[in-house]
Amino acid sequence: MKISCVLGKLLMLFELIHGLQDLSITCSESWLQVKLRRTPLLNDLQPLQNELSLGIGCPVNMVEVDFFGFLYLLTFCGIRVSEHGVGILIESLIVYEPTNFDFNLHIPVSCYVQRRFPIILVMRGRENDSRRECRRSVGQHRSLSHELEDLEIRPRVSYVNSVPLLSYLIVSLPKCKNKAVHSG
């Protein structure tokens, strides 16, 4: 009796693994979407909407002609989020509770999101010039381009994912005291 039960579960596992091409997983840094094709999962039985859940009891919330779908924020359903240096690993499972059987099937799902890194301003100091003061006459106005030249900020274009981004390379920023010099 135990052997037939084990063989039955192994057969179900094989059928599930073979049918995983019917599973679509999409994710972002804040949500997880899983679509399961409406095909028989076990013994030619097609799952019903109320027999499927994501994680800890989150029901199907998208019903399409060919798919059952789950779309939830990562803070729901007991979805596990593991943050790594370069990305986020998102893990959960689909629980299939067939009404005709005394056991549940668990289909693991996982998704990886690569982090987007922000533009970083890099500062490089100059030797023997850290005490430079900014001086300008009272009432003298300067354009932004002149201010940038004085601060030696040079714009450059970098390409990330084939999209040009404008970033600034800061060569040095003098420590300025807001002092005005009266020209007399």
UniProtKB/Swiss-Prot annotation:
Keywords associated with the record: Glycoprotein, Secreted, Signal
Leader sequence residues: 1-19
Keyword Glycoprotein: yes
Record Gene3D superfamilies: Zona pellucida, ZP-N domain
Glycosylation: residue positions: 128
Gene Ontology terms: cellular component: extracellular region
Localization per Swiss-Prot or TrEMBL: Secreted
Main location: secreted
Family the UniProt entry places it in: Belongs to the PLAC1 family.
Protein name (record): Oocyte-secreted protein 4A
Native source species: Homo sapiens (Human)
Gene name of the record: OOSP4A
